[in-house]
Amino acid sequence: RNGNSDLLCNEFMRGAAEAGHQVEKIFLKDKHINYCTGCSVCSMYGKPCPQKDDAAEVVEKMIAADVIVMATPVYFYTMSAQMKTLIDRCCARYLEIKNKEFYFIIAAAEESVPMMERTIDGFRGSSTAWKSPKNAAPFMAWMPGKWAR
């Protein structure tokens, strides 16, 4: 909380709220989301994921949303483990995450646009599994006043 990705997310939310949109921020670190175990209950049998954690609640909100903003700091050249874990857990309902407009907010400690682009590539790769995604230009920042789109 209160890190660069959080501050950037706050600004995005402020603009969306001022434009009349309903917004909600979810801190993945406050959620209990287990790793996908590859049990195939969802993919082979079409049943809900058997894990009892907060993933179903977050994925349900993603399905209901028109716009999804995924914000993450860059940890060791990619998105945070919490973000990747959530994306993996979307597997059970990925066909329902359709026609969404995605925004990606990336914050890094060093000025390396190629490093941040690798993180964006991870998001874009995941979002191609979802039906008809509309990926907006990413927002990347590193030091105060230093950013790129």
Task: Explain the meaning of each model-derived region.
Residues 93-99, 130:
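Short, conserved loop/helix-junction motifs that constitute active-site signature segments
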Residues 1-71, 75-93, 134:
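N-terminal beta1-alpha1-beta2 submodule of the flavodoxin-like/Rossmannoid cofactor-binding fold
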Residues 28, 106-109, 141:
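Cofactor-binding loop segments of dinucleotide-utilizing enzymes, especially the Rossmann-like FAD-
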Residues 67-71, 103-108:
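Short glycine-rich or small-residue beta-strand-to-loop segments that form or flank ligand, phosphate
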Residues 6-10, 116-121:
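Short, surface-exposed alpha-helical segments at coil->helix boundaries
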